[in-house]
Amino acid sequence: MSHGTSLDELFNSRDFIGRHIGPNADQTRAMLDAMGLDSIDQLIDLTVPASIRGEETRALAAPVNEQQALAELKNIAGNNQRFKSYIGMGYHPTYVPPVILRNVLENPGWYTAYTPYQPEIAQGRLEGLLNFQQMIIELTGMDMANASMLDEATAAAEAMAMAKRVARKNKSNTFFADKHCHPQTLAVLQTRASHFGFELVIGDITQDLNKQEVFGAITQYPGTSGEVKDLRPIVNQAHEQDALLIVAADILSLVLLESPGAMGADIVVGSNQRFGIPMGFGGPHAAFFGFREKYKRATPGRIIGVSVDTRGKRALRMAMQTREQHIRREKANSNICTSQVLLAVMSVFYAMYHGSAGVTRIAQRVHTLTKMLAQGLTAQGHKLAFDNYFDTLCVIVNDQQQGLFDRAQQAGVNLRKLDKNALTISLNECTSLEDIHQLLDIFSLGKHSQDVKSLETKALAAEVIPASCRREGPALNHPVFEQYHSETEMLRYLKRLESKDIALNHAMIPLGSCTMKLNATAEMIPVTWPEFGELHPFAPMEQAAGYSTLFTQLQDMLKACTGYDAISLQPNAGSQGEYAGLVAIRKYFEHLGQTERNICLIPASAHGTNPASAQMVEMKVVVVACDNLGNVDLNDLKAKVAQYGETIAALMVTYPSTHGVFEEEITAICDLIHSVGAQVYIDGANMNALVGLAAPGKFGGDVSHLNLHKTFCIPHGGGGPGMGPIGVKSHLAPFLAGHPVQPVPNTLVENGTISAAPWGSASILTISWMYIRMMGAEGMKRATEFAILNANYIAHRLQDHYPILYKGKNGYIAHECLLDLRPLKESSGITEEDIAKRLMDFGFHAPTMSFPVAGTLMIEPTESESQAELDRFCDAMIKIRQEASLVESGELPRDNNPLVNAPHTLDDALDETWTRPYTRDEATRPLPYLHAHKIWPTVNRIDNVYGDRNLICSCPSIESYTEE
């Protein structure tokens, strides 16, 4: 008798689990057999300490398939209301050119790449970022710019810290913030200043700056209520006391307004959102950061520079990396690791697509419509607070404020209440004549009858930007902004750049501690839904019921995965999550009256962001040693605890450790810290080895940040966006970050503000929601198990060729492993960099180099890679070891072999003469699979020293592009 298939199986609700996890059943069996294991359960029992095991993810709903998850989320999205928003405050409706939407934002060749630490296979993104820097340099009038920041408010806070670093002659500890800055910027400045130990004074900068002795000051240009004013008097007042003047500028206004740099500003920050990036209820967006060249070594963030490769060809790279957290740790200029690469390149492609004339036309249209609206409002008898404006009008309405606001709401329009007597209206790229008519109708209480078009002549004649503030000449002058105005040319340019880079759509990216797993297409689809993209972050919350549901459900999911009691979604990067967690700890101890606690214990193996974050909250970093097995040295930890006792605020520890092992004594470590009343911060960078097996909130953690762009499938975007929410135990929950504009449930404004938007980069939270919903408890656990299986399989295959530096007590690793290359360097002169570059010839991105131990490679394959891909990588690594053995034996010279000459380009392969002691095929196609498909690095090894000594961070002449 035959049996039918159950409906549960036919609906295939677990379908996605098998699509996300790489190895199939046969491959899994083969991998286990190779390691002499009976089952994955046996591997997990031998790897993960029993003392921390649990199954908290059982609280998750059962998995659903892709279609079901998309339908559920579409239903949630439908509860958001898409009003026309004229709120402004740094967020504006914009139009994403379809060629950029489809070929960048929706393209895995762009969104699945990693930060360009290996520049030879990242020349496309690097060119896009260099163009971005050029755009910011020209618009701001600064000498240099970095390759993006997280948002405008945190960029302003970073600028404040930078001002303190460089104003060495100035002994003041006071920073002045203009009250006309956006309120979210002021809130982030207040939070940062309080933990840096700065005094922050907020006032009217034109009247009060010269009453203070300050090391720096910031103003908004135009002001948050719309006024445009000459910056020169403010600049002069700041410079008279050796203080720096920071300007937070609106990027579209800079097309028509005189640049802050031309007026003497020292640092210029702002948001690129209105250059073709959806509002997304707060993000993600790229911020910009322009500065004077003399401050280049004090600036935060990535900087892209021009160098040369070994053939003398122009090549791009990340410059001056010694400023950054992964090298300088607590002495770094900033704790920022991820920036906003995907959004930065989208914004510059927007500028390149429109060109200087196009963006000028957009800015002039917005400005002209604003003048027409002003003419109509004044004709109705309304009074404007300012006569000088770009796109924002401040209308004095006195006791009519609430009535007009409500009338606008009834018409599907969002205005901004300013103080108690005014409403502001910020126009945007999407504003039409019909919108002007609607706004005039709202303000006339339905009595408006004037023909809107008739306002045009008078508006065109009106000069409302002061002569001293008008830009002379085009805003964008480099030829790169005049090359790609047709869709055909832009499409091909984007493809040319994409083809220069290795992303996950090419091959595994085995970067340790980075978790480059599958970013499934179904997870990405909702990101571009207008129901999520078109909401202003400060719109009334009743318009964002869908987002509220999304936040609540995702918080519950993350609580189930971590064992924590509360989740804050505000931090928009892992670095900001670390900062938010440490701020919560600080606030907690202030509440207890234990302000003497200022010691942060950090193991030597920690991520560089950990000490950099600790110093941002005025904690003193004390390093705890690691033992020969890679574990935290318990004896040294006990000694440090005895020495510092009740002055200890926190221990920051990554688990599993960055050495790639599950430390057996983690609960004892947590207990020891708790014994002196301190808090345990468990860095969530390696959560991909824990979800479904062990929860940090259950085995001793008080707070963790979660890299949603690692464990929970938000793509890395070539270096951003990311999201770094934090989970906390109940005693820390009252101290989570609030927001001054949009109240966050169960938080207080006085707790401080971490990011510009209340829920960070809200629109990409849909990705993690989709991932967890489609995986369910069963799938989340399986993902973790296969991450551990894949890593151990690689370690097993490579251990006879490279020493595995650290293993757990039973001889297994966690989800990543360290290959010790120091003996090889001693015997052959071959370095970890040589192997990293040689891997490019095999079509692979290198593992993480020299972290957490110098002279090593850290490999993390993730659960998404099949056995075939793991074998391909292992075959490449084994072949490289064989090549190195020829150097060891003297068959190949130390200074002329496939490793030290790597990577090999098409130019190398086509050289008319070949004088190297190995063949062209050995150079470029060292394994058979490369005969069928080959990814060519577009430049040879780049000269890092030359690039830093001859620092060029703007676009070369157009001739240098055509010469190539």
UniProtKB/Swiss-Prot annotation:
Reaction(s) catalysed by this chain's protein: N(6)-[(R)-lipoyl]-L-lysyl-[glycine-cleavage complex H protein] + glycine + H(+) = N(6)-[(R)-S(8)-aminomethyldihydrolipoyl]-L-lysyl-[glycine-cleavage complex H protein] + CO2
Record function comment: The glycine cleavage system catalyzes the degradation of glycine. The P protein binds the alpha-amino group of glycine through its pyridoxal phosphate cofactor; CO(2) is released and the remaining methylamine moiety is then transferred to the lipoamide cofactor of the H protein.
GO biological process, one term: glycine decarboxylation via glycine cleavage system
Lineage: Bacteria, Pseudomonadati, Pseudomonadota, Gammaproteobacteria, Cellvibrionales
Protein name listed in UniProt: Glycine dehydrogenase (decarboxylating)
Residues recorded as bearing N6-(pyridoxal phosphate)lysine in the entry: K710
GO MF term set: glycine binding; glycine dehydrogenase (decarboxylating) activity; pyridoxal phosphate binding
Name of a matching Pfam family: GcvP2_C
Family membership noted in the UniProt record: Belongs to the GcvP family.
Top enzyme category: oxidoreductase
Record keywords, A-Z: Oxidoreductase, Pyridoxal phosphate
HAMAP family, A to Z: GcvP
Assembly with partners or alone: The glycine cleavage system is composed of four proteins: P, T, L and H.
EC code(s) of this entry: 1.4.4.2
Cofactor(s) annotated in UniProt: pyridoxal 5'-phosphate
Cystine bridges: none
Gene Ontology CC, one term: glycine cleavage complex
